[in-house]
Amino acid sequence: MDHALLILVFLIGVAVLFDFLNGLHDAANSIATIVATRVLPPVFAVGWAAFFNFIAFLFFGLHVADTIGRGIVDPGIISDKVIFGALMGAIVWNVVTWLAGIPSSSSHALVGGLLGAGVAKAGTGAIVVAGVAKTVAAIFLSPAIGFMLALLLVLLVSWLFVKANPAFADRVFRGLQFLSASAYSLGHGGNDAQKTMGIIAILLYSRGMLGGEFHVPFWVVITCQAAIALGTLFGGWRIVHTMGSRITRLTPQQGFCAETGGAITLFAATSLGVPVSTTHTITGAIVGVGAAKRVSAVRWNVARSIVTAWFVTMPAAAAIGALFYAVGGLFLT
């Protein structure tokens, strides 16, 4: 096999591995609440989430892929070493946080890795400031919006069902959680898989393989959706436990509100091409439903440790990405 083609296949393989680990690491967010409320056992929940992760491309455009491909660093500086550094920065950080059971963001790990590798090659002038600012703003906005929507939904459904028989309300929201979990899984597949699509597409573009115009080939779309769905099937039970029960105890009603608030946030962000974190979004929503009950219902020490991981993720992945950019220079020539 031609050396250049071998390197291309290797880098696409690394990108698909990242997407798989994204499913393993982040897709637990899609099922944490439905598992915590005992509506579905984990083995069925992961299959449910994997299916909706896979079909997400049928519902959304590819705006997030475009942002990742052209809106974080200047496409003109993209090289094999930059892509390798970006992916390894995200993968290494994801593995470390997965082993520790910390729900950090795969999305911002990838952005951090791309920034670190891009700056290592071309300096800070390689940064697309507007795109990075949009992504950083999402760190704060996505959990805040998820929090507010979930809080308002809890207050609304509590008012609507205030006189309902508790057993009846429980049955209703157990059924509704199938819909809300499906919607959240669609949002996750729609936003997160597109980040890998953007990386592969910009790699192909940098090699002149897209006919001079940046776009995402259909085979890239299917490959990335399949990889994230398979990652979901292998699960991430440490993180499910943290997200679903250690932050606050959830009822089916609260689980429905958290998932619905999170799903609305993800749908809006994906439509606008904003690469947001599913971890940030569902955490904000879970905190919102817990706070609606009472502030003390939220285990703030657990939430605080998660927030700390958010702020560490991007710079840590950037440092790792810069390191692997240098490592890539040893064999990616």
Predicted regions and their residues:
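Multi-pass alpha-helical transmembrane bundle typical of ion/small-solute transporters
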Residues: 1-333
